[in-house]
Every structure is written in C-alpha cells, then in structure tokens.
C-alpha cells in the first residue's frame, strides 16, 4: 500500500450503485432522494457556522473534506433514511 492513498474509494463508487438501488424504486428517485438530503446536510453546515440549527446534520461519521452528496449516499446505504416521493417529485419526470 502506498502512503497517502485510501484503499476504499469514496463518492459514488462507495457505496456501489447496485446497493443504493435497493433503497429506491428507480435511478431518478435515488437521485432526487440523495440530492434533497445533500441539500439538507449542506444547509446544516452553513447554519452551524452561523449558530442556527434548523436542519438535521449527518447521521453517519464523516470527514471534513467529504461532500454532502457522498454523506447522503452513505446514509441511504445504511438504511438510516426512508424514501418518500411527494407529488411534485413523482410528476417531475413526466
């Protein structure tokens, strides 16, 4: 193992897309689900700097340089979130 490298890939490669698809009906639903959660996580970090806490922070351990979307995918993979599409989301793809 070379110094300075991480043996497990980050981002969309980890967790694998096949594992993530077990938690959503379609790739579209998974993308919407993860994007909404990533926006919540991003808002949480912004509010944390301002002293406001209106959103729920990450439900998994994370590193400071980790992107909100990667955190959201890991939360989905671990089954910590439940997917529900609203009317707007369900009709958006049509």
From Swiss-Prot:
Keywords from the named record: DNA-directed RNA polymerase, Nucleotidyltransferase, Transcription, Transferase
EC number, as in UniProt: 2.7.7.6
Entries under SMART domains matching the protein: RNA_pol_Rpb6 (SM01409)
Gene Ontology CC terms: DNA-directed RNA polymerase complex
Similarity-based family: Belongs to the RNA polymerase subunit omega family.
Oligomer and partners: The RNAP catalytic core consists of 2 alpha, 1 beta, 1 beta' and 1 omega subunit. When a sigma factor is associated with the core the holoenzyme is formed, which can initiate transcription.
Official protein name in the record: DNA-directed RNA polymerase subunit omega
Species this protein is from: Bifidobacterium longum (strain NCC 2705)
Lineage of source species: Bacteria, Bacillati, Actinomycetota, Actinomycetes, Bifidobacteriales
Gene coding for it: rpoZ
């Amino acid at each position: 193992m070379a110094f300075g490298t991480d043996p497990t890939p980050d981002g969309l490669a980890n967790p694998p897309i096949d594992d993530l698809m077990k938690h959503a009906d379609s790739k579209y639903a998974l993308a919407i689900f993860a994007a909404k959660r990533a926006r919540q996580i991003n808002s949480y970090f912004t509010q944390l700097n301002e002293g406001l806490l209106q959103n729920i922070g990450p439900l998994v351990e994370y590193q400071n340089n980790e992107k909100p979307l990667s955190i959201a995918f890991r939360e989905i993979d671990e089954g910590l979130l439940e997917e529900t599409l609203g009317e707007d989301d369900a009709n958006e793809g049509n």
